UniProtKB/Swiss-Prot annotation:
It is found in: Cytoplasm; Nucleus. GO terms for cellular component: cytoplasm; cytosol; nucleus. Residues 56-70, 254-267 have a biased composition (Basic and acidic residues). Residues 56-75, 254-279 are annotated as: Disordered. It holds the Pfam family Thioredoxin. This is Thioredoxin domain-containing protein plp1. Residues 137-248 form the Thioredoxin domain. Inhibits early G-protein signaling events following pheromone stimulation. May help create heterodimerizable beta-tubulin by facilitating the efficient transfer of nascent beta-tubulin polypeptides to the folding apparatus. Belongs to the phosducin family. The keyword Transcription does not apply. One of its GO terms (biological process) is protein folding. The modification Phosphoserine is found at residues 272, 275. Keywords: Chaperone, Cytoplasm, Nucleus, Pheromone response, Phosphoprotein, Signal transduction inhibitor.
Length: 279
């Protein structure tokens, strides 16, 4: 009876001078015949994938955003701007009363009632958006949250940052201002070190990196400051206009003194090329 070497039992098998690593290679590197499944295995795999999709839909139901649309209503825009700047000192009801009082100037009763009803609906949408985390710049801790927000929100702007990079802090300051006046978009950020899978999948090698998603589709990437004048003291309106071109936001706000550069004096001594490479 022929005896076989012990090496033919377990582990890699010898083929001449070449080791057969079929059983220890990643799935994507295995020969096609290794990946072939029986009909029963395929059925089980399909059922498992369907179950995962169902579970994911159930998990993301809590993240569903209200349907927000651009009303092109200057009064509603005024409400959002006023809320962003005065919410800390005045209640929502006081702000609404002040805006509703502006409608008293119209003599046309039918027009006034129509506008009043429209404003109430828009205010309800703004309040619903606030409850879902809009009008603020959220920090998330893991990749699952990023993907959930991307799938459940109509418009999402994501900043991949490093806590020690000065230019990441500059982008944070601009996005925080923009988020307060654009309730139709969700603004989030995540430390790049906490998102290794997304960093590799998206090919991010330079920080800061701002990614814009509309209807779960990537529509724009802003890497470093090359598209923002390649200088640290750019104005907030420049980034806002870039987001508008990408359809990540619906409209531009009126430029005011508070909408100009937020680049602080204490950062002016750090003028080195700080588009930071992320390893």
């Amino acid at each position: 009876m022929t005896s076989f070497p012990a090496s033919h039992g377990f582990g890699p098998r010898k083929r001449g001078y070449q080791m057969d690593l079929t059983n220890v290679q990643p799935v994507e590197n295995k020969p096609a015949w290794i990946s072939m499944k029986s009909p029963l295995e395929k059925e089980i795999a399909n059922e498992y994938e369907a179950l995962k999709v169902t579970e994911r839909k159930e998990d993301t139901q809590d993240y569903n955003e209200p349907e927000l649309h651009n009303s092109n209503d200057p009064t509603v825009d005024l409400y959002a701007d006023t809320y962003a700047t005065q919410a800390a000192t005045e209640s929502d009801s006081e702000l609404e009363d002040a805006l509703f009082s502006q409608l008293d100037e119209f003599d046309d009763t039918a027009y006034r009632e129509q506008r009043l009803e429209m404003l109430k609906k828009e205010f309800a949408r703004v309040e619903a958006a606030k409850e879902k985390g809009h009008m603020q710049f959220l920090t998330v801790e893991n990749e699952r949250e990023v993907m959930d927000f991307t799938l459940s929100s109509k418009k999402v702007v994501i900043h991949f940052y490093h806590p020690d990079f000065i230019r990441c802090k500059i982008i944070d300051s601009h996005l925080e201002k923009i988020a307060k006046v654009h309730w139709e978009t969700k603004f989030i950020r995540i430390e790049a070190a906490n998102a290794p899978f997304l960093v590799v999948k998206l090919g991010l090698k330079v920080l800061p990196a701002v990614l814009c998603y509309v209807n779960s589709q990537l529509v724009d990437k802003i890497i470093g400051f090359a598209d923002l004048g390649n200088k640290d003291d750019f104005e907030t309106s420049l980034l806002e206009f870039r987001l508008l071109k990408s359809s990540a936001i619906d409209r531009l706000k009126e430029e005011s003194s508070s909408n100009k550069s937020i680049y602080h004096d204490e950062l002016q001594n750090n003028q080195s090329d700080d588009s930071d490479f992320f390893e």
